[in-house]
Amino acid sequence: GWWMHRRSRGEATGDAGRIAAYALATTGFAALFLDVVAATTLHGFVSAPAGLGTGLLVSVAGLALADRWRARPLALGVVLSSAVCAPLITQLPDALLVGFLVLLQVAAAPVQVRRGWPSLALAAGVPVVLAALVATAWGSAFHDPVLVVAVSLAVLVGVVIAAITAGARPEADRTAIGLLVAAPTPAFLAGPLLLEAPAAGLLGAGTTALLLAIWAVARFVPAFRGWLSHRFTTAVGAMAAIAAGQTTVTAVDSTSWATALLCEALVLGVGAFLLRSTGVLLGASCYAAFGFLLALAGEAPLTALLWHGDAPGVPGLLCGLLLVAAAVLLPAAAVRVGEVPTSPLLWSATGLVLLHGAASATMAACLLVADTRDGFLTAHILITLSWVVAAIALLLRGVRHKHLRVAGLVLIAASLAKLLLFDLATLDGVARVVAFLCAGLILLAAGSRYARLLKA
């Protein structure tokens, strides 16, 4: 192959000669890999680590030759041959296999960055991810601490090489994003399958910290602000948000998932407000949506508002307050970012979250003071009156703003429906009188005030 490549430089059939040289060289390296497999697996002349070390040397030599010749097919053939032969040597999807493929990816990185070969990045990166996933699934039946280290190393190397590829080769941006999305997935699987909750949380936190560090450097460090593309930086932020959510679900008890996700939604909401970032706002909205759905099934269920006996306690109070804070903060952040939603459905959903959070917090607080039927009835009186007061405030503010006026009218209708359909059937005695009397007085005072504002 070397001889034919040298001859092809000065001949008219140079392209054909180069192709033949690439084919011969690739065949030669493939034969060397098969020799290593035979010496290790069939005849047992060398151990598996020694065989992998020899295979790595052959791969490095092949990549060096491909770089010198600028022969992408040769580089692909060497890397893929090495990746295919490695499982034949280890015979198990273990830490040794993952470690070898990580070293192979590191060896291929300088060549693919220097020559701008995105296909080589995929050929070196995809086997690492697949081997790490298979090894994690296999390792769930066997306790192997070294496997966790190998998977963590694979994630670290994969993410870093993806970032280097995106920065050094902007034209390979999509390939780098694909590698970035794939690289952390073994850590997402390894935490729940291989580790206990605290250790799994540390693994997930490390993955999140790595992704956040790359995002922060690309976003705030002036020297790197233009090095990574906006699309890649957005992808890093999205993967960091996914990693943080997966870490939360893995490390936190299921009874506190909603509270934890809502706390993270508030943190992201503050970040979106300060940074005026649409991507951060989208992440905060996703966290808040999942937190609300989990709250309905856990800390702040609807059953706690319908029947006495299912007291939410302190978790329900905290979760309700977090729902209220999220329902207020996220629209404020959207206004500051300049991405105010125009869909009435989104505003209606936000209003429902706000009402449910306030009602759940009120119910939990009253039942913490007196976990009796009187406490339950008092909570419903306060919930109804708070809805009426909020509706009046919206109507008064909506004299010149149609959307606020419509929201106030809808909330008034909901308050009266609750008063007549639920409170009338649930409350009795003094509680019923107090609820109707207070609601009527508030509506009377607000109606007269609203009429004066309209005349003015």
Which role fits each region the language model picked out?
Residues 1-385, 394-405, 417-456:
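Extended, compositionally biased regions that are outside compact catalytic cores
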